[in-house]
Structures are given as structure tokens and as C-alpha cells.
């Protein structure tokens, strides 16, 4: 009798059959989850980043009389904000690794011509042949390869295909949050010395309220995203998703060593491309494919 690990590996042996044309079509589609909570959280994420942009640029930097201080911090903060929002979009609109839906038909499973003792697993919820390390997401209503968790803030699952962008998103949000806190602290210190005279185009009470809210927002985002970033790096280096860790599943796969895991997620050896959320983005090709095959929505 085969062990559980052997039976699970049998699924991987049939992967060329399980991930045929349907998955290639899905990869060319625009992926978007129509979940009310997720869409609200994604909108809030963008709104809060835009608020930080407004306060940093129009309350702190532009009123400053120090040209180089304004230029250097303005370029750095806005550049990191663009990278953060791009990473958010890539995480949200990238297929996380959805298994083809409804392919576990009796006729199709018979066509696989399994050998005696070979076992494949079927997800009863989405009627899909379930590969090793795939889990069903009740929100996406799909089985996701190497599903780590479903994050409402990006309105998507974090899985095999978009984990890299999620890591970049948490890293860049943590970076702009820390930068905003430092700028706010320096601005408070400077304005108190001059008693807020000529410190801002806004009245002192309004400026103080805007800065306090920014500090609270930045502190909350910094704490949350820094923890998530550390958790994701730990999961990648240990080749274990958050679901597998919580379920305390015994590995039935050969774990990658730390750098192999990082290279598998970020693609290739260490380079600056690891930090580039635009890498691999072919907008023109994506638009052509979207017109040809339509968008894939999960309701």
C-alpha cells in the first residue's frame, strides 16, 4: 500500500495532463475577485496611501524652504509609493495559481489511464483535480497552488504566482510608513521651534491633526506590514506556507533550501530585479489577451 506522500506525488506525475490548455487560457486573462469586503479593503489601501502622499507632499515637503530636503525626500517617498501601489496591483490582478475549474469529470479522470495503486485527489467544492500543496479558498472559490492565505487588503489569495508581489507590497508599504514617521517627527520638531510660523500653508490646528492621523496610520501600517514581510520571508526560506504551518502538516515534498526557495519565488539569482514589481509586465500583450479571451472573475 502506498503512503500518503507517494499518493500525493502521483498527482504531480500527471501534472502535464492536469494543467493543459485551460490553465494557459486562464494565465492570459485578467484575474479579479469580486468580493465586497476585499474590494472595500483594496480601496481603503489606496485611499490611505493617497492620504499619506497628500500630507507628506503638501503639508511637510512643499512648504519647506530647504530645496534639497524637499527634492530628496519627495523623490524617495513618491518613488517608493509608486512601487508599493504597483506591487499591490500586481498582487491583486495576478492569478495566484488557480487550478482549472471543473476538470475532475469522470470521463477526464478515466482518460488519465492511472496505473494500479495510483491516486489523484478531487476537490468536491470546485470539482477540480487537486495537485499537491493546493488548498481550496472559499472566497476565490478555487483551489490555489501553494496557497499561503487569502488577504482582503489585496483582494486575492497569496499563492504560487503572486507571492513575490505580495512580499514587495509589504516591504514597500513598511518603507514608506517608516519614512512618513521620520518626516513627521522632524516636521513636528522643526515647527515647534518656530512656533508653527511659516511652517505650513495650513493653520496649525489643521496641520497638527493631519500629522497625528498620518503618524497613527504609518505606525499601524509599519507594524502590520513588517510582521507580514518577516512571516513571508520565513515561509519562503522554510518552503512552508502559512496554511501548512497552521495545520502542522508533515511535508510530503522535498523542501527547498533557503536560497533555492527565494530564487524560486523571485525568479533567478539575487539581483535588483527581485525588487522590481514591473518585471515581467507586458501591458500591451495582456490587453490583447484580455480582448481575445475576456476577463476571469470570481464571484
Swiss-Prot record:
The DHHC domain covers which part of the protein? 122-171
Quote any Pfam family the record assigns: DHHC
- List the InterPro entries hit by this protein, alphabetically: Palmitoyltrfase_DHHC, PFA4/ZDH16/20/ERF2-like
GO CC annotation terms, alphabetical: endoplasmic reticulum; Golgi apparatus; Golgi membrane
Q: Which residues lie on this side of the membrane: Cytoplasmic?
A: 1-41, 88-164, 230-299
Q: What post-translational changes are documented for it? A: Autopalmitoylated.
Q: Report the GO molecular function annotations.
A: protein-cysteine S-myristoyltransferase activity; protein-cysteine S-palmitoyltransferase activity; protein-cysteine S-stearoyltransferase activity; S-acyltransferase activity
Tell me the active site. 151 (s-palmitoyl cysteine intermediate)
Q: Where in the cell is it found?
A: Golgi apparatus membrane
UniProt keywords, alphabetically: Acyltransferase, Golgi apparatus, Lipoprotein, Membrane, Palmitate, Transferase, Transmembrane, Transmembrane helix
Annotated EC = 2.3.1.225, 2.3.1.-
Q: How does it sit in the membrane?
A: Multi-pass membrane protein
**Catalysed reactions listed for this entry:** L-cysteinyl-[protein] + hexadecanoyl-CoA = S-hexadecanoyl-L-cysteinyl-[protein] + CoA; L-cysteinyl-[protein] + tetradecanoyl-CoA = S-tetradecanoyl-L-cysteinyl-[protein] + CoA; L-cysteinyl-[protein] + octadecanoyl-CoA = S-octadecanoyl-L-cysteinyl-[protein] + CoA
Residues assigned to the Lumenal compartment are 63-66, 186-208
> What sections of the protein cross the membrane?
42-62, 67-87, 165-185, 209-229
Entry note about domains? The DHHC domain is required for palmitoyltransferase activity.
- How does the annotation summarize its subunit structure? Homooligomers.
Q: Which family does it belong to?
A: Belongs to the DHHC palmitoyltransferase family.
Q: What does this protein do?
A: Golgi-localized palmitoyltransferase that catalyzes the addition of palmitate onto various protein substrates and therefore functions in several unrelated biological processes. Has no stringent fatty acid selectivity and in addition to palmitate can also transfer onto target proteins myristate from tetradecanoyl-CoA and stearate from octadecanoyl-CoA.
Q: What is this protein called?
A: Palmitoyltransferase ZDHHC7
Amino acid at each position: 500500500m502506498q503512503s500518503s506522500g507517494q499518493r500525493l506525488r502521483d498527482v504531480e506525475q500527471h501534472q502535464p495532463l492536469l494543467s493543459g490548455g485551460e490553465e494557459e487560457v486562464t494565465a492570459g486573462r485578467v484575474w479579479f475577485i469580486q468580493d465586497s469586503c476585499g474590494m472595500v479593503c483594496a480601496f481603503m489601501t489606496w485611499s490611505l496611501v493617497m492620504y499619506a502622499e497628500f500630507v507628506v507632499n503638501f503639508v511637510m515637503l512643499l512648504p519647506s524652504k530647504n530645496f534639497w530636503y524637499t527634492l530628496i525626500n519627495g523623490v524617495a517617498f513618491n518613488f517608493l509609493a509608486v512601487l508599493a501601489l504597483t506591487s499591490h496591483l500586481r498582487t491583486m490582478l495576478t492569478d495566484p495559481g488557480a487550478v482549472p475549474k471543473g476538470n475532475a469529470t469522470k470521463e477526464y479522470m478515466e482518460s488519465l489511464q492511472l496505473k494500479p495503486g495510483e491516486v489523484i485527489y478531487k476537490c468536491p467544492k470546485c470539482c477540480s483535480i487537486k495537485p499537491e500543496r493546493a488548498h481550496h479558498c472559499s472566497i476565490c472559490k478555487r483551489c490555489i497552488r501553494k496557497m499561503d492565505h487569502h488577504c482582503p487588503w489585496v483582494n486575492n489569495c497569496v499563492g504560487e504566482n503572486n507571492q513575490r508581489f505580495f512580499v514587495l507590497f509589504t516591504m514597500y508599504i513598511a518603507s514608506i510608513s517608516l519614512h512618513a514617521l521620520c518626516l513627521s517627527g522632524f516636521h513636528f520638531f522643526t515647527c515647534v521651534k518656530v512656533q508653527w510660523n511659516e511652517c505650513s500653508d495650513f493653520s496649525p490646528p489643521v496641520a497638527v491633526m493631519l500629522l497625528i492621523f498620518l503618524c497613527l496610520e504609518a505606525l499601524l501600517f509599519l507594524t502590520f506590514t513588517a510582521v507580514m514581510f518577516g512571516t513571508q520571508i520565513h515561509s519562503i526560506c522554510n518552503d512552508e506556507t502559512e496554511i501548512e504551518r497552521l495545520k502542522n502538516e508533515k511535508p510530503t515534498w522535498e523542501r527547498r533550501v533557503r536560497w533555492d526557495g527565494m530564487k524560486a519565488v523571485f525568479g533567478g539569482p539575487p539581483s535588483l530585479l527581485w525588487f522590481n514589481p514591473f518585471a515581467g509586465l507586458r501591458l500591451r500583450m495582456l490587453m490583447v489577451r484580455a480582448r481575445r479571451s475576456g476577463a476571469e472573475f470570481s464571484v
